[in-house]
Amino acid sequence: MEGKMANVYDVLKERGYLKQLTHEEEIREILGKEKVTFYIGFDPTADSLHVGHFIAMMFMAHMQQHGHRPIALAGGGTGMIGDPSGRSDMRTMMTVEMIDHNVECIKKQMQKFIDFSEDKAILANNADWLRNLNYIEFLRDVGEHFSVNRMLAAECYKSRMENGLSFLEFNYMIMQAYDFYILNHKYNCTMQLGGDDQWSNMIAGVELLRRKDRKPAYAMTCTLLTNSEGKKMGKTAKGALWLDPEKTTPYEFYQYWRNIDDQDVEKCLALLTFLPMDEVRRLGALKDAEINEAKKVLAYEVTKIIHGEEEATKAKEATEALFGSGNNLDNAPKIEVTDEDFSKELLDVLVDRKIIKTKSEGRRLIEQNGMSLNDEKIKDVKFTLNDNTLGLLKLGKKKFYNIVKK
């Protein structure tokens, strides 16, 4: 657990969470002096949080550990509109039943990070005030504080103008700003936290409170979880890396972190574990074969936070058992691949590297469930590699290869 610094701002800064802040000096001062109620919103687009939400949950957890009160806001109302930020198309519309089911699932996962006992944190759902909103009153009360010109200049809308932005989605920013307004009135919430892709929406909430009520309001964004090449982390051969063990097993989850790029280890240890920063820096400074020890620590710590100590230990032991008989991934023969290989079928790459003699040999292995990548069976004979499908390739029972990018 992080040693108690006087101010959580310094902890967040040192660990690399902070990206953009509305009033940096004021925020640092109030976080050091007051108990702040803050919120982060989660739209229920699926019945599980994924690794992209993980960093926001850690952001909340650090704030709570330093005496501040989190509100985890489930978007049961905004989820019916869909956030256009970072999207080139319109989200599929979900039914009320789907949204409510997803909200319940997400609430359970949040309790792994946040202590909701004795009013230490609040679980709220914006469906409570958005679904039965009086449209005319809302327009008169809130709409007058928004400039359409300024809204259209926001990055989240600008990128959508060419492909078409629906009026439904155009309302999202105002709805999110209204959430902040309501949470301020109900719980004296004065700060919003969120991913950096939410910056435009968050500024709207801060400005609404400051204009309408002449009250102090603040926003901080956290960095998005990207690898050393700037690509979003958390994708596997199966798709997203989920926090639900039914969707991504603890073993698969452990393996993902065990096999990340060397350059990403220190950043992930800082953002996704509670290890002291001295230890994070020590592990991050390890080189060559030694960095694998740091990856084991990362995989264990992250899996422990999400799935508990027992599942983390099981995943660690399963990995050691798999590689225990001389099949250690660090010592396994490497298959070095380039960007050019990502457009080829895996079987063609294996024939090129003389790992298998013919494609028909590879097809037979796949048909007999004898080929897996990071413990996931390959079922498609036309399977192609990409940045997120590197790691342990197993052919039959005894052949192991470490697929790495050259």
Swiss-Prot record:
Residues 344-404 form the S4 RNA-binding domain. Keywords: Aminoacyl-tRNA synthetase, ATP-binding, Cytoplasm, Ligase, Nucleotide-binding, Protein biosynthesis, RNA-binding. One of its GO terms (biological process) is tRNA aminoacylation. One of its GO terms (cellular component) is cytosol. The keyword Transport does not apply. CDD domains: S4 (cd00165), TyrRS_core (cd00805). ATP binds at residue 235. InterPro entries: aa-tRNA-synth_I_CS (IPR001412), aa-tRNA-synth_Ic (IPR002305), Rossmann-like_a/b/a_fold (IPR014729), S4_RNA-bd_sf (IPR036986), SYY-like_C (IPR054608), Tyr-tRNA-ligase (IPR002307), Tyr-tRNA-ligase_bac-type (IPR024088), Tyr-tRNA-ligase_bac_1 (IPR024107). Its main location: cytoplasm. It is found in: Cytoplasm. Disulfide bonds: none annotated. A motif ('KMSKS' region) lies at residues 232-236. It catalyses: tRNA(Tyr) + L-tyrosine + ATP = L-tyrosyl-tRNA(Tyr) + AMP + diphosphate + H(+). It holds the Pfam family tRNA-synt_1b. Its EC number is 6.1.1.1. One of its GO terms (molecular function) is RNA binding. L-tyrosine binds at residues 39, 172, 176. A motif ('HIGH' region) lies at residues 44-53. Belongs to the class-I aminoacyl-tRNA synthetase family. TyrS type 1 subfamily. HAMAP family: Tyr_tRNA_synth_type1 (MF_02006). Catalyzes the attachment of tyrosine to tRNA(Tyr) in a two-step reaction: tyrosine is first activated by ATP to form Tyr-AMP and then transferred to the acceptor end of tRNA(Tyr). Homodimer. This is Tyrosine--tRNA ligase. It comes from Fusobacterium nucleatum subsp. nucleatum (strain ATCC 25586 / DSM 15643 / BCRC 10681 / CIP 101130 / JCM 8532 / KCTC 2640 / LMG 13131 / VPI 4355). The lineage of its organism: Bacteria, Fusobacteriati, Fusobacteriota, Fusobacteriia, Fusobacteriales. The gene is tyrS.
